[in-house]
Amino acid sequence: MDLSKLQNGSDVRGVALAGVENEPVTLDDAAVRAIAGGFARFLRARLGKESCRVSVGRDSRLSGGAIAETLCETLAACGAEVTDLGLCTTPAMFMTTVTGERPFDAAVMITASHLPWNRNGLKFFTAAGGAESADVREILRLAAEETPFAPGGSVARGEFMETYAAILREKIIAAANGNEKPLAGKHIVVDAGNGAGGFFAERVLAPLGADTAGSRYLDPDGRFPNHVPNPELPEAMDSIREAVLESHADFGVIFDTDVDRAGAVLSNGEELNRNRLIALISAILLREHPGTAIVTDSITSTGLAEFIAAHGGVHRRFRRGYRNVINEALRLNAAGQDCQLAIETSGHAALKENYFLDDGAYLVTRFLMEIAAGRSLESLLEGLYEPVESREFRLKILAEDFRAAGTAVLDSLAEYAKEQPGWSIAPDNCEGVRVNLDKAHGDGWFLLRLSLHDPILPLNIESDREHGARTIARELAPFLAQQTEIDASSALEFTL
């Protein structure tokens, strides 16, 4: 098998279990062994050490245990000192490389985030951070070569989630001036979606005095029987919103499968995801770091940009992909512009104070620090103007070479936009084609971009008036109807 096909940006992803029609297993035992060998060789070259200490963790996926066993055995056979940490979160696995008197040299997290039950994957970490796409390419290249077995390896069992939870608890206690029960009297519910996030209710909130009654789906179950653990999905946010309102909670928290993303709900049922989530953490950080830059992905609203500017911040809209926004934040800091936050509307949030690690639990902890200090989260959102309407369409690219075809469509759109009355191409856009439309032509904007990994052109539309999204779609319809390499039917049907 060509292992390079398992690369998905800075991760490895594949089908790990049979059972879905037309989805043959690609991340099988042989592939895991080869990749483990490639990672061992990669570490030897990168760290300059013959023997490394490596931690291995997994989320609740059904295939996780078997993959972990194979991974640990192979790494040990390559001379590594391996500790299997069992059920963990992705952020916690990175923290094993920077925590304690003897941090691990590297970590591997077994997860496929929010993908279906039959999928799984691998994320790689050292103390320098998560692997880049180029690192994963090199690991898979080395994996295709013969595994370099070496003596001296071992496999042990361990536990880290209590250590990680203690770090989060201490942050909240410090924000409350040392009060050991800073959340006493607060009712906070968690929806873990049967992923790895149940620990947050049991090991963070409850020990700090919070009432967590009404929390949902805390038990790990890799079948994900209740809803997909993905804060971007309406059904997931509906679940935590329902939990908050039914239990009359003060606050609600929802995580994705491996807890590198989060969303939240206020006591009145108002959802904190996408633009609201970014606005809330931006307001907190701009109070603490006036003038700092906030890097976001490309589909944030005009109202969010105005909110960040009104709070004295510098908004840098960048390309989708959590590694992209993190790397842009690192670049800004290196260039002399303080940047405290890299965040996506998907719920990935990486703070400078936390190793620029995208960590959903840490993001929520920052909100709980405000609550513990007696501050109102609702007041922090005052002044955020939100669009009246927003829509997203996913236009399938029909051509085999989808990148070339998608790029050609975007190039054509950029030229087309220049000739349209009431249209203006956004000057601060770094991905796809973003066009602002005046009041007579829809009073909003649209963004057409190429998906990071899939043969899709996502189309986002926002308008500041009722029926404005349909007006904008109608403005764009003549162009879309001419594009033979894409299926634009969903957007075109919306115009009817």
Give each language-model segment a name.
Residues 59-65, 115-116, 193-198, 259-260, ...:
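Gly/Ser/Thr-rich loops at beta-strand to alpha-helix junctions
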Residues 49-59, 83, 187-189, 292-298, ...:
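Short glycine-rich phosphate-binding loop at a beta-alpha junction
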Residues 1-71, 77, 154-185:
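An N-terminal, well-structured beta->alpha segment
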Residues 101, 118-244:
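Gly/Ser/Thr-enriched, mixed-charge loops and adjacent short helices
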Residues 289-496:
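Phosphate-binding and adjacent anionic-ligand microenvironments
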Residues 41, 53-119, 203-265:
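N-terminal small/polar loop signature for handling phosphorylated ligands or for N-terminal nucleophile
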Residues 76, 85-86, 90, 141-170, ...:
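Proline/glycine-rich low-complexity loops and linkers
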